[in-house]
Regions:
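Acyl-donor binding region in acyl/amide transferases
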Residues: 2, 10-38, 42-43, 51, ...
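Intrinsically disordered, low-complexity, positively biased terminal segments
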Residues: 74-201
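Terminal substrate-recognition subdomain of acyl/acetyltransferases
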Residues: 1, 7-13, 29-114, 125-129, ...
Length: 201
């Protein structure tokens, strides 16, 4: 298993005393003892962490799509699964389960503790406050959904007279292609939305 490094840093008055190096050296020793040969870090400044043996493993990609450009040419839309919209609280355990299944066969995804879900993915305060309320759309049977999207919907962010709203995707997971197509069809049906943005695709 990979070790995950969380926030690390020193206050300015304690910098350049080797404190971070000591913390990292000790952490690496403990990780080695646990059999963790690899460590991952989401760095604010990648160049700083090269001195500790880290390197960039990927790039962040983002997309912005006009809803008028979302088309499902391969299968059409007649047999797509149902999508239902919810507030996050009642479906948190459901989406956590879908996420765990979704990441099981994929590389680069991290296990998320409840705090990460509540603050980062579903949070409506702090840095996320301007995004507006958070919604979860579940796709598939109500008793066994096959995918979800966590998103916000806000008005006045698209320079279009008839479609001024924007959907911001926070998280998206699907367990089969019908669920994936169903979620994108759900976006396309938002007639007042001029843009679907996914900053961390």
């Amino acid at each position: 298993p990979m070790a995950g490094i969380t926030v690390i840093g020193t206050r300015p008055e304690y910098r350049r005393q080797g404190l971070v190096r000591r913390i990292m050296t000790r952490a690496f020793a403990e990780q080695r003892e646990r059999g963790q040969a690899l460590a991952g870090l989401w760095a604010s400044q990648a160049a700083i962490y090269q001195r500790y043996g880290f390197t960039a493993a990927g790039l962040n990609r983002g997309y912005a799509i006009d809803t008028a450009d979302i088309m499902l040419l391969d299968t059409g839309t007649q047999n797509l699964p149902t999508v239902t919209r919810h507030r996050p609280g009642p479906v948190l355990d459901t989406i956590r389960g879908i996420y765990r299944t979704f990441i099981a066969g994929r590389t680069g995804y991290l296990h998320r503790g409840k705090a990460l879900w509540l603050e980062t993915v579903l949070g409506e305060t702090g840095a996320n406050a301007a995004d507006g309320p958070v919604y979860v759309a579940l796709v598939g049977p109500v008793d066994a959904p096959r995918g979800y999207v966590v998103y916000t919907l806000r008005a006045g962010h698209v320079a279009h007279r008839a479609r001024p709203q924007e959907i911001k995707i926070r998280d998206l997971a699907w367990l089969d292609m019908d669920a994936y197509r169903g979620l994108w069809h759900f976006f396309a049906k938002h007639d007042l939305v001029g843009r679907v943005a996914w900053a961390n695709a």
